[in-house]
A protein has these predicted regions:
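Peripheral, non-AAA+ core regions of ATP-driven protein-machinery
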Residues: 1-120
Length: 120
């Protein structure tokens, strides 16, 4: 299954649109984030995995590929935790995303609570 979640990135004090694309397929279980993520974005894998389980959902035992587009722009910080979580849940057909144009960003605690992010 495939899902897309709108988010925002920060370049100094300027924001730019980021599309979080999530593709879940059969195969060897794995969780990869591509699209020039920094260490904090790569660490989202563990925060999101814990948050999904602690919010009462089942984390998919599948191959998960997340693309942060535009792929040529470096992504940094923890603000992608929430859109990554929503992308996985939407691609797993566990939640429906709103049809309206909105962007999601926020850091997640391991228990699934939202935390503020710098610059927003």
């Amino acid at each position: 299954m495939l899902s897309r979640v709108r988010s925002m990135g920060l370049n100094g004090i300027r924001g730019y649109e980021v599309s979080v694309e999530c593709y879940i397929t059969n195969g060897l279980p794995g969780f990869e984030i591509v699209g020039l993520p920094d260490a904090a974005v790569k660490e989202a894998r563990e925060r999101v995995r814990a948050a999904v389980k602690n919010c009462g959902f089942r984390f998919p035992v599948s191959r998960i590929t997340l693309n942060l587009a535009p792929a040529g722009t470096k992504k940094s910080g923890t603000l992608y935790d929430l859109p990554i979580l929503l992308g996985i849940l939407a691609a797993s057909e566990l939640v429906r995303l709103p049809k309206t144009e909105c962007a999601f960003l926020g850091e997640l605690s391991l228990e699934g609570k939202l935390r503020p992010v710098r610059g927003v």
